[in-house]
Amino acid sequence: MDDIFTQCREGNAVAVRLWLDNTENDLNQGDDHGFSPLHWACREGRSAVVEMLIMRGARINVMNRGDDTPLHLAASHGHRDIVQKLLQYKADINAVNEHGNVPLHYACFWGQDQVAEDLVANGALVSICNKYGEMPVDKAKAPLRELLRERAEKMGQNLNRIPYKDTFWKGTTRTRPRNGTLNKHSGIDFKQLNFLAKLNENHSGELWKGRWQGNDIVVKVLKVRDWSTRKSRDFNEECPRLRIFSHPNVLPVLGACQAPPAPHPTLITHWMPYGSLYNVLHEGTNFVVDQSQAVKFALDMARGMAFLHTLEPLIPRHALNSRSVMIDEDMTARISMADVKFSFQCPGRMYAPAWVAPEALQKKPEDTNRRSADMWSFAVLLWELVTREVPFADLSNMEIGMKVALEGLRPTIPPGISPHVCKLMKICMNEDPAKRPKFDMIVPILEKMQDK
C-alpha cells in the first residue's frame, strides 16, 4: 500500500480511512519536507480527505519546513471550499512563512481572486509586508488590488504598510509535524537510551528526561517488587495497547523495554516541555491559564476521553487526573497512556482519590461503570481548571478516600464561576452514575463555550 502522503495527495478516501482506523498511525506526522497529510490534501484540493483528517484531529496550523500552513497551500491553489473549511476550524489567517508571506500573498500572486476576497472578509491583512517589503495587494492585478483595499477599509483595516518583523510569530508556538519514524519502534534497545536528567521519583518509579534517535523523550522506569517471568510476559502483552498514535489528544507510549541489570520495565514517551496539567496549574509555569485556555484544555481532554471510550475493550486501569494529562508544546492537552497502570502494579491501591468517583472508591473495578466514573473525574478536573486549586489539598489521600466514599465530601464550587461551566460541572458530577453524560455529548457543549 502506498504511504499516507500519497493517498492524501491522490484523494484516496477509503485508503485514508483505513489508515486512520489503525491506532498506531499518527496523522500529524510529516514527510521528508515536513508536509503533514493535511498539507498534501489541502494542496491537491482533496475536500473529503481534508474533512476526514480535521474530524480525526489533524492540527490546522501545522507548518512544513518552509513554515507554510495548510491554509497557505489551499490559498495558493485556489481551493476555495478548503480555505473556508480551514477558516471554520480556526486556521491562523495571517500565519507567516519563512519568506514573511501570509496566505493572502499567495492568493493575490496566483490570481485566486475569490479566495483572496474570502480571506479579506475573514480578517486577512492587506498591508502586511513580507521580508522583501511587499504587501499582499502589491502582488495582485489592478482590479483585484483596488477591490481588496476597498473591502479592507470597509472592515476597518488601516491601509498603511505594516513592516515585516521577525517578531510576528514570537510568543506563538510553531507547530511542526512529528517525526514519522517514532511510531515504528515498539521494542526499544535500552542501550540506545540516553538518560539526561531525573525529573521525578515516586511510589511507581523514576521519571527521566532523555534522548533517543535524536528526539527528546521521557523515560519512565517502573518500580516493581519480585519481578518474575509472568510479570515480564504481562508487561509485553499489555504495552502494545498503549501505543495510540491516531488521536491528537492522546499521548502514546512510543515503546518499551526491560532495563538491565535487574529488569526494570521501562516506558518511553514524547517529551512535553510544559509537563502535566498539574504542573501547569499548580507549580508556577510561565503562563496563566485564563478562562478561554481552561475551556480549550477541557475540550482537549473531553475529545481524548471520547476517543478512548470508543475502544473495545476499554484500556484497563486508566485513572483520569491532572497528573495523567500532559500539555504539548502548542498548549494541547493530551491523555497520557504512560500513566496507565499495569496488572502487576499494586492492584487495588488508589494514589489520587481526590479525582476518583465515590462509587469507584466503594466498589471493585469490575462492579463499576468505568465510563461514568471517568466523567466524575473530568468534573473534578473542570473544578481544578476554574479554581486553580488542588482538590482537598489539606487532607491526606487516606482521609480523602474515606470522606469522599463514606461522608459525602465533594468539591465546593466557589462564587464567580461562569454559570455555563458551573452547570456542566454539576451535570458531570451527578451522584447517580447512570445520569452522567457521555464524553461525546459534552464535546459539542464545550465547543460552543469555546466559540463564545
Swiss-Prot record:
Q: Which compartment or compartments is the protein found in?
A: Cell junction, Focal adhesion; Cell membrane; Cell projection, Lamellipodium; Cytoplasm, Myofibril, Sarcomere
Q: Which GO terms describe its cellular component?
A: axon; cell cortex; cell-cell junction; centrosome; chromatin; costamere; cytoplasm; dendritic shaft
Q: Which residues carry this modification: Phosphothreonine?
A: 173
Q: What residues bear N-acetylmethionine in this entry? A: 1
PTM comment, free text: Phosphorylation by PAK1 modulates ILK subcellular location by promoting its nuclear export.
Report residue spans for region: PH-like. Answer: 180-212
Q: Where are the ANK repeats?
A: 2-30, 31-63, 64-96, 97-129, 130-174
Record-listed Phosphoserine modification sites = 186, 246
Q: Which GO terms describe its biological process?
A: branching involved in ureteric bud morphogenesis; caveola assembly; cell differentiation; cell morphogenesis; cell population proliferation; cell projection organization; cell-matrix adhesion; establishment or maintenance of epithelial cell apical/basal polarity
List positions binding ATP: 200, 202-204, 270, 272, 279, 341
Task: Give the matching Gene3D superfamilies.
Answer: Ankyrin repeat-containing domain, Phosphorylase Kinase, domain 1, Transferase(Phosphotransferase) domain 1
Q: Where is this motif: Nuclear localization signal?
A: 363-371
N6-acetyllysine modifications at: 426
Q: Which controlled-vocabulary keywords does the entry list?
A: Acetylation, ANK repeat, ATP-binding, Cell junction, Cell membrane, Cell projection, Cytoplasm, Cytoskeleton, Magnesium, Membrane, Metal-binding, Nucleotide-binding, Nucleus, Phosphoprotein, Repeat
Regarding domains, what does the record say?
A: The kinase domain is likely to have lost catalytic activity but retains ATP-binding activity. ATP structurally stabilizes the kinase domain and promotes stability of binding to PARVA as well as focal adhesion stability.
User: What's the subunit arrangement here?
Assistant: Component of the heterotrimeric IPP (ILK-PINCH-PARVIN) complex composed of ILK, LIMS1/PINCH and PARVA; the complex binds to F-actin via the C-terminal tail of LIMS1 and the N-terminal region of PARVA, promoting F-actin filament bundling. Formation of the IPP complex is dependent on protein kinase C and precedes integrin-mediated cell adhesion and spreading. ILK also interacts with LIMS2/PINCH2 and with PARVB and PARVG which may substitute for LIMS1 and PARVA in the IPP complex; PARVA and PARVB compete for the same binding site.
The function of this protein is:
Scaffold protein which mediates protein-protein interactions during a range of cellular events including focal adhesion assembly, cell adhesion and cell migration. Regulates integrin-mediated signal transduction by contributing to inside-out integrin activation.
Family named by the database record: Belongs to the protein kinase superfamily. TKL Ser/Thr protein kinase family.
Stated name of the protein: Scaffold protein ILK
Q: What's the source species for this entry? A: Rattus norvegicus (Rat)
